[in-house]
Amino acid sequence: MTPSDASGGAPSGAAAGRWSSLDRPPLNAAALERALVGDGGLWSSVEVVAATGSTNTDLAARAGQLPEGAVLVAEEQTAGRGRLDRSWVAPARSGLFFSVLLKPGDSVPQERWGWLTLLAGVAAATGVSRAAGVDTALKWPNDLLITVEGEERKTGGILAEPVSYT
């Protein structure tokens, strides 16, 4: 992920070659669906797209038509958003970009919704640490960090936002 400049591209001075040799194979949508969607599970559907502006924006626009637990995954994000509406871009296959639709309704009081970012961050940090065997940390309020060569680097972020839908 790189912060975008005013033109929406990579920041000035960013090394273009840094992102030019990403060799991760494309995501296997069918395998993700088999692994994540099942009776009694948390996720109702998984959709993988090659590119999008923002998975959050796309999922929010369709929230009224989708069931709770819908997951949208993108190989590339061109208009990612973070806290305080900060924008960033992420070239194809440079990371994992996804959004999950939750519909807590009356089962979770609204005053508790603010905990979602922290809870998701703890879960993500634990998952990355266990799966990759790396030290992870959370930087308040929503950044996921890993240690690389003695330096903490941002490896992800959590953005939870309420959406009105009918």
Predicted regions and their residues:
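N-terminal lobe of the biotin/lipoate ligase/transferase fold
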Residues: 1-130, 148-157, 161
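FAD-binding subdomain of flavoenzyme oxidoreductases
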Residues: 137
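A cytosolic small-molecule/anion-sensing beta-strand core signal
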Residues: 140
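Conserved small/polar residues in nucleotide/adenosyl-binding loops
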Residues: 166
